[in-house]
């Protein structure tokens, strides 16, 4: 669902409230539930889309990232303590209990199980984040066993249907209560909910169907990313079981600070120092930018702390056009350890400006010029 609008999937406008999202999900989940639409592949796909949309829009951090970056490149959002594996019903288990007799959590175990998502933190230099870069990363993930093709059974052997649950993965228990007879379902202990018995497990994966593998993956990082951005790589997570879809790999960006530049959003800031005389008279300075040095004319009378803007010299906007700006803060250095000639020049300057001297300054000047004679 890489290019679909999650809000549109739920029939909502962007910016919908949490309550509106929950209500829309509940209504559509009931309408398109596979048990209510047996054999309808279109309804099954719609149900998957609804689940995916709700999984993002119901999580504040994921929703924030999706609203900011869209589904094309950065619709992944943050990571909760439980990771991304599986679909969290978020209090809607009763919807599925309507069709499964209260066994929604166990019912899925004998069918395809989607792979878990993986989180990977990638640290970039300041320059790599500004210009974009291709990185090779190494991830350890669960993959389908090549020896048994993910079946879990040793080649040449096969699984058999569990005789206890007849392949359903569940057992039904009838209980008598003061209120009448109730039927509940639970996971079959004999097959652990898979519905099948493996008589001779695969010698490579020990009947699991998946094995751990270390893979190298090339990641193209677009220009303009910043710390906290999350980039999803669809289908690069852990492999599923029994034909389930693979999870996704989420790249969390961390950018190392620059020794010279400070970044705020798409704008860059840098300090430059000039003398008191140059600040008063004006001067041309050389300013370092991420693209190289540029000349800038500082007007006369510039005060310390003044900001000047270099338009379009900032960071590229991710998934958009244009760049931010660079701001140059001028720091006027006050000289220390003046020699006699420099002090005389400053006293002369004070007199030319008509500044009044206090008693101590006047006495100091008198002694200074007296020593000169």
Swiss-Prot record:
Cystine residue pairs: none
Domain J span(s) in chain numbering: 5-70
Residue intervals of every CR-type zinc finger in the record: 132-214
Note describing how the cofactor binds: Binds 2 Zn(2+) ions per monomer.
GO biological process terms on file: chaperone cofactor-dependent protein refolding; DNA replication; protein refolding; response to heat
Xref: InterPro entries: DnaJ, DnaJ_C, DnaJ_domain, DnaJ_domain_CS, HSP40/DnaJ_pept-bd, HSP_DnaJ_Cys-rich_dom, HSP_DnaJ_Cys-rich_dom_sf, J_dom_sf
GO molecular function term, any single one: zinc ion binding
Function, in words: Participates actively in the response to hyperosmotic and heat shock by preventing the aggregation of stress-denatured proteins and by disaggregating proteins, also in an autonomous, DnaK-independent fashion. Unfolded proteins bind initially to DnaJ; upon interaction with the DnaJ-bound protein, DnaK hydrolyzes its bound ATP, resulting in the formation of a stable complex. GrpE releases ADP from DnaK; ATP binding to DnaK triggers the release of the substrate protein, thus completing the reaction cycle.
Domain comment as written in the entry: The J domain is necessary and sufficient to stimulate DnaK ATPase activity. Zinc center 1 plays an important role in the autonomous, DnaK-independent chaperone activity of DnaJ. Zinc center 2 is essential for interaction with DnaK and for DnaJ activity.
PANTHER family: CHAPERONE PROTEIN DNAJ, DNAJ HOMOLOG 1, MITOCHONDRIAL-RELATED
Subunit and partners: Homodimer.
Protein name: Chaperone protein DnaJ
Species annotation: Clostridium botulinum (strain Alaska E43 / Type E3)
Gene this chain is encoded by: dnaJ
């Amino acid at each position: 669902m890489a290019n679909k609008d999650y809000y549109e999937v739920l029939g909502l406008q962007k910016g919908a409230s949490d309550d509106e999202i929950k209500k829309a999900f509940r209504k559509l989940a009931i309408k398109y539930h596979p048990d209510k639409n047996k054999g309808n592949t279109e309804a099954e796909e719609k149900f998957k889309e609804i689940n995916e949309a709700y999984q993002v829009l119901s999580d504040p951090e994921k929703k924030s990232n999706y609203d900011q970056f869209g589904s094309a490149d950065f619709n992944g959002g943050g990571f909760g303590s439980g990771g991304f594996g599986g679909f969290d019903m978020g209090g809607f288990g009763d919807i599925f209990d309507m069709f499964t007799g209260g066994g929604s959590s166990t019912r899925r175990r004998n069918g395809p199980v989607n792979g878990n998502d993986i989180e990977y933190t990638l640290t970039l230099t300041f320059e790599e984040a500004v210009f974009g870069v291709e990185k090779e990363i190494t991830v350890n993930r669960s993959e389908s066993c090549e020896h048994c093709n993910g079946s879990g059974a040793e080649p040449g052997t096969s699984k058999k249907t569990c005789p206890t649950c007849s392949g359903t993965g569940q057992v039904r228990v009838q209980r008598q209560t003061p209120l009448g007879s109730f039927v509940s379902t639970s996971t079959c202990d004999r097959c652990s909910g898979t519905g099948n018995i493996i008589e001779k497990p695969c010698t490579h994966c020990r009947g699991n169907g998946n094995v751990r593998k270390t893979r190298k993956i090339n990641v193209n990082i677009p220009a303009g990313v910043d710390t906290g951005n999350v980039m999803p790589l669809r289908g690069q997570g852990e492999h599923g079981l029994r034909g389930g879809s693979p999870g996704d790999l989420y790249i969390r960006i961390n950018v190392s600070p620059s020794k010279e530049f400070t970044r705020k959003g798409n704008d860059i800031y840098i300090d430059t120092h000039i003398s008191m005389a140059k600040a008063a008279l004006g001067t041309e300075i050389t300013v370092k930018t991420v693209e190289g040095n540029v000349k800038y004319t500082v007007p006369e009378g510039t005060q310390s702390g003044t900001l000047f803007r270099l338009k379009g010299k900032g960071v590229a906007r991710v998934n958009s056009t244009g760049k931010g700006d660079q701001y140059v803060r001028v720091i006027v250095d006050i000289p220390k350890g003046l020699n006699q000639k420099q002090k005389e020049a400053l006293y002369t300057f004070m007199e030319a400006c008509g500044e009044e001297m206090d008693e101590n300054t006047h006495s100091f000047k008198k002694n200074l010029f007296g020593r000169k004679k």
